[in-house]
A protein has these predicted regions:
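Short loop/helix-cap segments at secondary-structure boundaries that form the rim of catalytic
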Residues: 73-74, 137-142
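Short amphipathic alpha-helical segments and helix-helix/interface helices
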Residues: 24-28, 115-118, 140-141
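N-terminal strand-loop element at the rim of the active site
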Residues: 41-95
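Conserved nucleotide-sugar donor-binding subdomain of glycosyltransferases
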Residues: 82-136
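Flexible, charged surface loops at secondary-structure boundaries
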Residues: 1-4, 31-32, 72-75, 119-124
C-alpha cells in the first residue's frame, strides 16, 4: 500500500461527470493515505466553441478566463484541478508528424499547468498515475 506520498492522477474521465468512474474511485482510495490531485482534461478548441452550453463547460470557460479558480479541494487529501489551458484538437489528424507535434505541444502546456498547481499545493516527491490517457499521458513530463 502506498502511504504518505503526493500523487497526480490523470485520465480521460473528468471529476465532475455525473456518472462514477474507476479512475475517480482509485483517486479517492489513494487519498485515504496520500495527498492526491486529480487533473481533468483541458477543454479543446472544439469543446470551447462548439459544445452546447452546460454548467460543466461554462465553469471550465470561467477558469480559462481567470474568473474562477481551477483548483478545488474535494476532501481532506484530494483536490480537483481544471487547467486553464485550451488544447489544439488532435483526434481527427491523420498525419503522424502533425499529430505528434500537436500532442507534444498540448502535453507541454498541460505539464506547465500541473506544475503550477503542484507548487501551490507544495507537492514535492510525487507519483504520476496515468489512467487511460494513452497519447497525452505518454508525453507528460512534470
Amino acid at each position: 500500500m502506498i502511504k504518505d506520498k503526493d500523487i497526480i492522477v490523470i485520465g480521460i474521465q473528468a471529476w465532475d461527470i455525473e456518472i462514477g468512474s474507476n479512475c475517480k474511485n482509485i483517486a479517492a482510495e489513494f487519498a485515504k493515505y496520500n495527498r492526491v490531485i486529480y487533473v481533468n482534461n483541458p477543454l479543446s478548441f472544439l469543446d470551447f466553441f462548439k459544445t452546447k452550453k452546460s454548467e460543466r463547460i461554462e465553469k471550465r470557460k470561467r477558469i480559462v478566463f481567470g474568473k474562477e479558480n481551477g483548483l478545488r479541494k474535494v476532501s481532506n487529501n484530494l483536490w480537483e484541478f481544471n487547467p486553464k489551458t485550451v488544447f489544439a484538437p488532435t483526434n481527427r489528424i491523420k498525419q503522424n508528424y502533425l499529430f505528434d507535434r500537436l500532442t507534444r505541444y498540448n502535453a507541454k502546456k498541460l505539464s506547465n499547468e500541473i506544475l503550477r498547481a503542484l507548487n501551490l499545493l507544495e507537492f514535492k516527491d510525487y507519483i504520476l498515475f496515468n489512467d487511460s490517457s494513452m497519447f497525452l499521458g505518454n508525453q507528460i513530463k512534470t
